[in-house]
Amino acid sequence: MFNNITDDDRGQVGIGTLIVFIAMVLVAAIAAGVLVNTAGFLQATAEDAGEQSVNKVTNRVEVLNTHGTVGGEEDIDNITLTVRLAAGSDAVDMNETSIKYLSGDSVVTLTNQTVTSGANSATNDSAEGVADSDEFGLSEVTDDDGSFGVLNSMNDRYEVTIDTAAIETSDGDNTNLIGGLSTGEQVTLEITSRTGGTTQVILTMPQQLAGKTQNEPVEL
């Protein structure tokens, strides 16, 4: 009628409870380790993403001024931009910078093929050091430390030259030129550094070039 409870029975129940408790502790420890590792991975990933985002915003150039050069057909044959580092930017290597050129008739990505030929001078791979249909030219205005091609000081100034006459061609090369950018035409330039920082410039050609002579500079 009554169950007899012995000391042996109570001991077996105690051991079972202890085993379950130890197993729960081990599972909790493993789970905690996984959570710590996951949190560390997520933190590192977030830091990398944040650094990349900052670079895209800060590591870029600033365009100080622009002008065009009048061609022989009352158009703009060349565009020149004076650039420097944007505020807060780290060094920008113009040799690893690209420019997307977009007009009403043409779209092309330009790279810098300028090579140094001395401490503070440069010549372009193209004829007579002039940019062509897929390259932009680069020349020094000021460069305190002689590191031509790399903007690494707020005092550095370079001129970027884009040959619009070569780009706006009928056959995609430097033959059969049909002129540069016409009066009133608009062109968009996106200057992108190696880290992804982008500066956009939208330029509109003068509405009229009457009285302007060939090779005369005009403000854009």
From Swiss-Prot:
GO CC term, one of those recorded: archaeal-type flagellum
Main localization, broad class: other
GO MF term (any one): structural molecule activity
Keywords: Archaeal flagellum, Glycoprotein
Residues linked to a glycan: 78, 95, 112, 124
Subcellular location: Archaeal flagellum
InterPro entries in the record: Flagellin/pilin_N_arc (IPR013373), Flagellin_arc (IPR002774)
Stretches of the chain forming a coiled coil according to its record: none
Propeptide: 1-11
GO term, biological process aspect, one: archaeal or bacterial-type flagellum-dependent cell motility
Superkingdom: Archaea
Phenotype of the disrupted gene, per the record: Straight flagella, mainly at the poles. Cells lacking flgA2 but not flgA1 are hypermotile, display an increased number of flagella per cell, as well as an increased flagellum length. Cells lacking both flgA1 and flgA2 show defects in motility, whitout affecting surface adhesion ability.
PTM (free text): Glycosylated by a pentasaccharide similar to the S-layer glycoprotein, probably comprising a hexose, 2 hexuronic acids, a methyl ester of a hexuronic acid and mannose.
Biological function: Flagellin that plays both structural and regulatory roles in flagella biosynthesis. Does not constitute a major flagellin in terms of abundance contrary to FlgA1: may regulate the flagella-dependent swimming motility depending on the relative abundance of FlgA1. Not involved in PibD-dependent surface adhesion.
Family of the protein in this entry: Belongs to the archaeal flagellin family.
Entries under NCBIfam families matching the protein: arch_flag_Nterm
UniProt name for this protein: Flagellin A2
